[in-house]
């Protein structure tokens, strides 16, 4: 039995356990759709964010590189409901070594496509960039709304969680970090 078929069977059983009739018209294809969605939403489990940094160029650029407002969505590993928001990824190249800008967004994408915690997502992106490029500094900020806080429990829609990881010069130099935060927040 394929992975998709196993997930379909599990969703079918879940619907039954919840008191639904999985054979009624509106639910007939739901197990198949949910299985397909989960396989898509969790396809980042098959990749390493660090592997996204395949293109490295010697450009002589030694100032900050920042890609901000990278949209993402992920699934909270505690409740398997979405959280979504934006990521800001910055680094200071070492010896002028830079990567393609899309690689920063790809690292966020791969790290977010799995059952995840926002804190871990932030850490994984920062350390993938650090390990791949060995830059002078790395800073990653993730801002997200969590459906586990909006739809259930405390029910506070619109509240945002912000996580950061600072490495190298961004960890050591508060002025440099403040300058970067100003760039991030300056729309």
Swiss-Prot record:
Pathway: Cofactor biosynthesis; 7,8-dihydroneopterin triphosphate biosynthesis; 7,8-dihydroneopterin triphosphate from GTP: step 1/1
InterPro entries on file: GTP-CH-I_C/QueF, GTP-CH-I_N, GTP_CycHdrlase_I, GTP_CycHdrlase_I_CS, GTP_CycHdrlase_I_dom
Binding site for Zn(2+): 76, 79, 148
GO terms of biological process kind: one-carbon metabolic process; tetrahydrobiopterin biosynthetic process; tetrahydrofolate biosynthetic process
E.C. number(s) listed in UniProt: 3.5.4.16
Record's catalysed reaction(s): GTP + H2O = 7,8-dihydroneopterin 3'-triphosphate + formate + H(+)
Record-level Gene Ontology MF annotations: GTP binding; GTP cyclohydrolase I activity; zinc ion binding
Pfam families the record matches: GTP_cyclohydroI
UniProt keyword annotation of Phosphoprotein present: no
GO cellular component, one term: cytoplasm
EC class name: hydrolase
Keyword Hydrolase set for record: yes
Entry keyword set: GTP-binding, Hydrolase, Metal-binding, Nucleotide-binding, One-carbon metabolism, Zinc
PANTHER family the UniProt entry points to: GTP CYCLOHYDROLASE 1 (PTHR11109:SF7), GTP CYCLOHYDROLASE I (PTHR11109)
HAMAP family, per database record: FolE
Family from the record: Belongs to the GTP cyclohydrolase I family.
Subunit structure as annotated in this protein's UniProt entry: Toroid-shaped homodecamer, composed of two pentamers of five dimers.
Name by which UniProt lists this protein: GTP cyclohydrolase 1
Gene: folE
């Amino acid at each position: 039995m394929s992975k998709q078929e196993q997930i379909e069977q599990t969703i079918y059983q879940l619907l039954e356990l919840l008191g639904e009739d999985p054979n009624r018209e509106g639910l007939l294809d739901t197990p198949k759709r949910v299985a397909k969605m989960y396989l898509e939403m969790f396809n980042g489990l098959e990749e390493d964010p660090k592997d996204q940094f395949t293109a490295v160029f010697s450009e002589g650029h030694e100032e900050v590189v920042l890609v901000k407002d990278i949209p993402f969505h992920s699934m909270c590993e505690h409740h398997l409901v979405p959280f979504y928001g934006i990521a800001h990824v910055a680094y200071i190249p070492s010896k002028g070594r830079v990567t393609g800008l899309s690689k920063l967004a790809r690292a966020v994408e791969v790290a977010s496509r799995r059952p995840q915690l926002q804190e871990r997502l932030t850490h994984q992106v920062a350390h993938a960039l650090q390990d791949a490029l060995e830059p002078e500094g790395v800073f990653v900020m993730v801002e997200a709304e969590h459906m586990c806080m909006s739809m259930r429990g405390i029910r506070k829609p619109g509240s945002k969680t912000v996580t950061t990881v600072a490495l190298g010069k961004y960890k050591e130099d508060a002025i440099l970090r403040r300058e970067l935060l100003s760039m991030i927040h300056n729309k």
